[in-house]
A protein has these predicted regions:
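Mature catalytic core of soluble alpha/beta enzymes
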Residues: 2, 7-249
Length: 249
């Protein structure tokens, strides 16, 4: 009857009101998300530097982004001064210069990477060997004067490729290369380690969204400001202007 009809009208009115309220909430939520993304975009900071023989770029979303990127670059420079094979006063350069002569003191960072490199040599059955440096140098890769060494040159250098002759003393915090002419090069893992260190630093400084690109070593913090994952293009080695795929991180 009439009472049932009135109850139905009240119910319909409540349902419609709920729809409008929910719709309004949804719209406001979307607006709030857009405003948040815009605010984060305004806090976007970018920087490019050259270190460890490669170009490095940072994209950081944080109100103190400029200072954070300065701190990140200082950390990179600190590690470069320890691990570089080309800087004459680096710990690695000093270790190489004293091969077959004496042990040299090293920092915790350098000791950790030397230990890791020795472990990787064992895990890969010698496929990764930091003592390959004299052979790499013979090809001219480190001096931009590429040439093909003779078999006699390579045969003379191969005895220096000897991971077991890298002697580490954690007690004394020293490293020693047992054969004169030996040299180590941590280039295969140093930038990855540096990327991890920079990522840790940025997180400690409150960064929740960033992309760190150290040559071919890429690290991401959180997602992009709009909530989507970072997309990394994998370069086509046969055509550097093209890519073979995308990886979401």
């Amino acid at each position: 009857g009439e009472e049932t009809y009135m109850n139905w009208k009240k119910t319909a009115a409540l349902v419609l009101a709920s729809v409008f309220i929910l719709g309004g909430c949804s719209e406001k939520r979307e607006q709030a998300q857009q405003m948040l993304a815009q605010a984060k975009e305004e806090n976007r900071h970018e920087a490019t530097t050259f270190a460890m023989d490669t170009i490095m770029t940072f994209t950081v979303y944080h109100e103190d982004g400029e200072q954070i990127m300065t701190d990140a670059e200082q950390e990179i420079r600190r590690l470069e001064r320890l691990l570089s094979v080309t800087m004459e006063d680096s710990e690695i350069a000093q270790l190489n210069a004293n091969a077959g002569k004496q042990a040299v003191p090293v920092s915790e960072d350098t000791m950790y990477l030397l230990k890791t490199a020795k472990e990787m040599d064992e895990l890969t059955n010698g496929c990764y060997d930091m003592t390959i440096s004299p052979v790499v140098k013979a090809w001219g890769f480190t001096e931009e004067e590429h040439h093909v060494p003779t078999q006699a040159e390579l045969d003379a250098l191969m005895p220096l490729v000897d991971n077991d002759s890298v002697i580490l003393s954690e007690e004394d915090q020293t490293a020693y290369l047992a054969k004169e002419g030996m040299a180590v090069d941590l280039g295969g893992i140093a930038k990855g380690y540096t990327s991890d260190a920079v990522t840790k630093l940025m997180k400690e400084e409150g960064v929740e969204s960033a992309l760190i690109w150290l040559g071919g070593n890429i690290s991401a913090i959180g997602n992009k400001p709009d909530g989507n994952p970072w997309k990394i293009a994998v370069e086509n080695p046969l055509n550097t202007e093209d890519y073979v795929g995308l990886v979401e991180v």
